[in-house]
Design a protein with these regions (language model features):
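Short aromatic-glycine-(Arg/Gly/Cys) micro-motifs in beta-strand/loop hairpins
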Residues: 1-16
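Short, surface-exposed loop and linker segments with low hydrophobicity and enrichment for Pro/Ser/Thr
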Residues: 1-3, 35-38
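Generic structural motif
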Residues: 10-12, 24, 47
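A short, exposed loop/beta-hairpin motif centered on an aromatic-Gly-Thr core
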Residues: 15-26
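Short, mixed-charge low-complexity intrinsically disordered segments
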Residues: 36-64
Length: 64
């Protein structure tokens, strides 16, 4: 079973939870889609590992 990853959008009021997605690859795809359709900064958070990736309309940054 895939782990669940939460996608957040960065807002001036702090992080806004968008959705929970099963599987890291699917979460990255969904985050990229969100960044293209609703520009802004997004990040993926894992309960186990914390923030693992950030996405803007321009690029994806993987967090080691």
């Amino acid at each position: 079973m895939d782990s669940i990853y939460d996608i957040f959008k960065v807002t001036s009021n702090g992080p806004l939870w968008i959705e929970a997605v099963p599987g890291l690859d699917r979460a990255k795809e969904q985050m990229a889609y969100l960044a293209l359709t609703s520009p802004g900064e997004y990040f993926i958070h894992s309960q186990e590992h914390g923030v693992i990736a950030k996405q803007t309309q321009e690029f994806l940054e993987e967090i080691p």
